[in-house]
Amino acid sequence: MNKHQCGMIRMPYIAKKNLEKCRQCGFCDEIACSSAYVGYAKECTGCGACSIACPYEAIQMIEIQNGKSISITLDGAIISVLERVTIKKALEMCGYEPCEFPGDGNLFSPCRTGGCWSCAVLVNGELRPCCVTAVKEGMYIDTKTEVTPKRPVHGWMGHAVGGVGTPWRLKKLSGFIETACFTCGCNFQCAQCQNWTSTYNGREIALTPREAALLMSDSRRTYRVDRMAISGGECTLNRKWLIEYLRELKKKNTDDKARFHVDTNGSILTPDYLEELVEAGMTDIGIDLKSLELDTFTHITGVMNRELATKYLETAWNAVKYLVDNYPEKVFLGVGIPYNKDLISLDEIQKMGDKIRTIDENVQVCVLDYRPAFRRSYIQRPEYEEMVNVWRILSGTGLKTVICQTARGHIGPEI
């Protein structure tokens, strides 16, 4: 068998902590890093996940010069690549096209942290995310064989409030109203991420759809609820996994009371994906519309590629309209809007309300009061009076069901 030299050389990197910025929080070593620990020269894959995940931006990726070439087998062909680059980089050197929107390339790898496993390939017979797994001498990589998908999921819990896609009447009840779990990995890099320990988690155990469905069904029995929600991170990134998970969950919960709730940013929910979700059993969905304007969207989400950001933003808005037009009775839809004066203006909030009203004045709209978190610890959580004002603005557009999350609990649809 001949050895092939792949194309453009991609030098390996190693992570290095900037001790002047580092606060010793341990997140990079204990949660984000998929190898031993950040900066461990022998095992560092140079993937950059720790750098993306550090709340203090204290990790730099340093290029390593004069890397040694090694041999790996890719789909039966022996190829030569630099050691300690990720499999994703090796695949890119061999002609694969990584992308962050489905169909823009042939290697969908949106999270870059090893959280979503959309890019997983067989490595020596074991499924591994190629974005954080380093090549090693003699490694056998199989990108062709179809296998049962896996994805890291955690945090099964009872939820007393629910999410954007939870009907507002249930939010008034006491006790748990649904059970939820959280997938790791996200295609956004929100500096104020409200759930960043899931978004940047690279160490959680990956589960098959059936394993996750069993745990969710057990959680339903534990908390004695009928609603089962999956959130994140961003739960829709690994499409094959999510569809199989919903099908497995529906098989294990065949009663009429069971509700299957998907909580999402909607950024890749094309019509064919939505159709597949409905067919798989989805009964409720909450879609977070981050903004109306592109500049606001990039500011909130950290997606700086404007072409990609435009696709994400338009896809989410289109998903809302598609569900309203095609499944007004079959699928309960809730729309989420973020609010913090440092992130989005009241004028844009009103324009979002106007646009949602033209789609459906009766759709449930839930405004989320973004609190200080992750890299935007300096922002202030909106005051109660601010959220009352937001409620009045949105209700004034003609929307009939506006709910606002506040430090004192939810307000609306009437106050």
Task: Report residues per predicted region.
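Conserved AdoMet/S-adenosylmethionine-binding subsite of the radical SAM
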Residues: 210-377
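A cross-taxonomic marker for long C-terminal extensions/tails that follow the last structured domain
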Residues: 384-415
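Eukaryote-biased recognition of intrinsically disordered, low-complexity regulatory segments
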Residues: 65-78
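N-terminal [4Fe-4S]-dependent radical SAM core
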Residues: 4-14, 80, 84, 96, ...
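Glycine-rich phosphate/adenylate-binding loop and adjacent beta-alpha elements
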Residues: 51, 108-147
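Immediate flanking context of iron-sulfur cluster ligation sites
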Residues: 15-16, 42-44, 92-127, 176, ...
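Iron-sulfur cluster-binding cysteine motifs and their immediate structural context
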Residues: 14-17, 23-41, 49-65, 118-128, ...
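Short, structured interface segments
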Residues: 44-64, 137-153
